[in-house]
Protein backbone atom coordinates (compact mmCIF):
# COMPACT_ATOMS: atom_id res chain seq x y z
CA UNK A 1 0.00 0.00 0.00
CA UNK A 2 1.05 3.62 -0.31
CA UNK A 3 1.61 5.90 2.68
CA UNK A 4 -1.57 7.76 1.74
CA UNK A 5 -3.58 4.57 2.31
CA UNK A 6 -2.97 4.88 6.06
CA UNK A 7 -4.62 7.37 8.40
CA UNK A 8 -2.32 6.28 11.24
CA UNK A 9 1.44 7.02 11.26
CA UNK A 10 3.89 6.88 14.18
CA UNK A 11 7.65 7.46 14.02
CA UNK A 12 10.49 6.58 16.37
CA UNK A 13 14.23 6.00 16.40
CA UNK A 14 15.77 2.52 16.30
CA UNK A 15 17.81 1.84 19.43
CA UNK A 16 21.18 0.13 19.29
CA UNK A 17 19.87 -2.60 21.61
CA UNK A 18 17.37 -3.62 18.90
CA UNK A 19 20.12 -4.58 16.46
CA UNK A 20 22.22 -7.70 16.06
CA UNK A 21 25.83 -8.58 15.22
CA UNK A 22 25.09 -7.96 11.53
CA UNK A 23 24.44 -4.30 12.32
CA UNK A 24 20.74 -4.40 11.43
CA UNK A 25 17.50 -4.70 13.38
CA UNK A 26 17.17 -8.23 14.77
CA UNK A 27 14.37 -10.14 13.03
CA UNK A 28 12.17 -10.63 16.12
CA UNK A 29 12.09 -6.86 16.64
CA UNK A 30 9.81 -6.45 13.62
CA UNK A 31 7.03 -7.96 15.75
CA UNK A 32 7.91 -5.50 18.55
CA UNK A 33 7.55 -2.67 16.04
CA UNK A 34 4.19 -4.07 14.91
CA UNK A 35 3.08 -4.17 18.55
CA UNK A 36 4.08 -0.53 19.00
CA UNK A 37 2.17 0.34 15.83
CA UNK A 38 -1.01 -1.46 16.93
CA UNK A 39 -0.84 -0.04 20.47
CA UNK A 40 -0.51 3.52 19.16
CA UNK A 41 -3.09 2.91 16.40
CA UNK A 42 -5.67 1.71 18.92
CA UNK A 43 -4.84 4.72 21.10
CA UNK A 44 -5.37 7.08 18.14
CA UNK A 45 -8.67 5.36 17.28
CA UNK A 46 -9.66 5.68 20.98
CA UNK A 47 -10.64 2.02 20.81
CA UNK A 48 -10.72 1.44 24.57
CA UNK A 49 -12.90 4.55 25.08
CA UNK A 50 -15.61 3.03 22.87
CA UNK A 51 -15.56 -0.13 25.00
CA UNK A 52 -16.91 1.92 27.92
CA UNK A 53 -15.03 -0.17 30.48
CA UNK A 54 -15.94 -3.55 28.98
CA UNK A 55 -12.97 -5.92 28.69
CA UNK A 56 -11.57 -5.94 25.18
CA UNK A 57 -8.88 -8.60 25.19
CA UNK A 58 -7.15 -10.11 22.18
CA UNK A 59 -4.70 -12.89 21.40
CA UNK A 60 -2.57 -12.80 18.27
CA UNK A 61 -3.62 -15.83 16.25
CA UNK A 62 -1.26 -15.22 13.34
CA UNK A 63 1.57 -12.82 12.54
CA UNK A 64 3.28 -12.79 9.17
CA UNK A 65 6.38 -10.64 8.62
CA UNK A 66 7.47 -9.91 5.07
CA UNK A 67 10.94 -8.35 4.94
CA UNK A 68 12.05 -6.05 2.11
CA UNK A 69 15.15 -4.15 3.29
CA UNK A 70 17.26 -3.78 6.45
CA UNK A 71 16.76 -1.21 9.17
CA UNK A 72 19.91 0.17 10.78
CA UNK A 73 20.69 1.39 14.30
CA UNK A 74 19.81 5.01 15.12
CA UNK A 75 17.62 5.24 12.01
CA UNK A 76 14.23 6.95 12.17
CA UNK A 77 11.40 4.69 11.08
CA UNK A 78 7.70 5.20 10.58
CA UNK A 79 5.09 2.55 11.30
CA UNK A 80 1.63 2.69 9.79
CA UNK A 81 -1.39 0.57 10.63
CA UNK A 82 -4.90 -0.01 9.35
CA UNK A 83 -7.62 -2.61 9.74
CA UNK A 84 -8.09 -4.60 6.56
CA UNK A 85 -10.75 -7.09 7.70
CA UNK A 86 -13.08 -7.83 10.57
CA UNK A 87 -14.75 -11.15 11.16
CA UNK A 88 -17.10 -12.53 13.77
CA UNK A 89 -14.38 -12.89 16.43
CA UNK A 90 -11.25 -11.47 14.81
CA UNK A 91 -9.62 -8.48 13.15
CA UNK A 92 -6.86 -8.47 10.57
CA UNK A 93 -4.59 -5.46 10.71
CA UNK A 94 -1.76 -4.48 8.41
CA UNK A 95 1.37 -2.76 9.66
CA UNK A 96 3.93 -1.25 7.30
CA UNK A 97 7.39 -0.28 8.49
CA UNK A 98 9.14 2.41 6.45
CA UNK A 99 12.38 4.31 6.69
CA UNK A 100 11.42 7.90 7.54
CA UNK A 101 12.48 9.91 4.51
CA UNK A 102 12.73 13.70 4.42
CA UNK A 103 10.72 13.94 1.21
CA UNK A 104 7.99 11.52 2.35
CA UNK A 105 8.81 9.01 -0.39
CA UNK A 106 8.05 5.35 0.15
CA UNK A 107 10.90 3.40 1.73
CA UNK A 108 9.15 0.16 2.67
CA UNK A 109 11.26 -2.13 4.87
CA UNK A 110 8.69 -4.70 6.03
CA UNK A 111 5.02 -5.49 6.37
CA UNK A 112 3.37 -7.35 9.23
CA UNK A 113 -0.07 -8.91 8.87
CA UNK A 114 -1.70 -9.58 12.24
CA UNK A 115 -4.83 -11.59 12.95
CA UNK A 116 -6.06 -10.85 16.48
CA UNK A 117 -8.88 -12.81 18.09
CA UNK A 118 -11.20 -11.27 20.70
CA UNK A 119 -11.13 -13.61 23.71
CA UNK A 120 -12.71 -14.28 27.07
CA UNK A 121 -9.67 -14.26 29.36
CA UNK A 122 -11.25 -16.64 31.88
CA UNK A 123 -11.30 -19.48 29.35
CA UNK A 124 -9.01 -18.11 26.58
CA UNK A 125 -11.63 -18.86 23.94
CA UNK A 126 -12.83 -16.62 21.09
CA UNK A 127 -15.91 -14.48 21.65
CA UNK A 128 -17.78 -12.29 19.15
CA UNK A 129 -16.54 -8.78 18.50
CA UNK A 130 -18.99 -6.11 19.62
CA UNK A 131 -21.01 -4.66 16.74
CA UNK A 132 -19.36 -1.22 17.03
CA UNK A 133 -15.78 -2.42 16.43
CA UNK A 134 -15.84 -2.53 12.63
CA UNK A 135 -17.40 0.92 12.34
CA UNK A 136 -14.88 2.56 14.67
CA UNK A 137 -11.87 1.31 12.70
CA UNK A 138 -13.52 1.92 9.32
CA UNK A 139 -14.34 5.52 10.26
CA UNK A 140 -10.79 6.18 11.45
CA UNK A 141 -9.12 4.51 8.46
CA UNK A 142 -11.34 6.44 6.03
CA UNK A 143 -9.40 9.58 7.03
CA UNK A 144 -6.40 8.36 5.00
CA UNK A 145 -5.40 10.76 2.23
CA UNK A 146 -5.95 8.22 -0.56
CA UNK A 147 -9.27 7.14 0.94
CA UNK A 148 -10.51 10.74 0.99
CA UNK A 149 -9.46 11.18 -2.65
CA UNK A 150 -11.32 7.99 -3.62
CA UNK A 151 -14.46 9.14 -1.81
CA UNK A 152 -14.33 12.56 -3.47
CA UNK A 153 -14.04 10.97 -6.92
CA UNK A 154 -17.01 8.65 -6.32
Predicted feature residues:
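Catalytic strand-loop segment that frames the active site of acyl-thioester-processing enzymes
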Residues: 1-40, 44, 154
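HotDog/MaoC-like acyl-thioester-processing domains
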Residues: 2, 9, 67-76, 84-154
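A broad, structural micro-motif
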Residues: 25, 58-60, 109
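Short, solvent-exposed helix-to-loop capping segments enriched in aromatics
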Residues: 45-57
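Small beta-barrel nucleic-acid-binding modules, principally OB-folds
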Residues: 54-73
Amino acid sequence: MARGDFAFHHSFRVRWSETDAQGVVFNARYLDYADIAITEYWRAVKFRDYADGAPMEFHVKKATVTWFAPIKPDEMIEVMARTIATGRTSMTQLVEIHGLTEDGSDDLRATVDLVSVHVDLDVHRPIPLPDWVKGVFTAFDSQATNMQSSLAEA
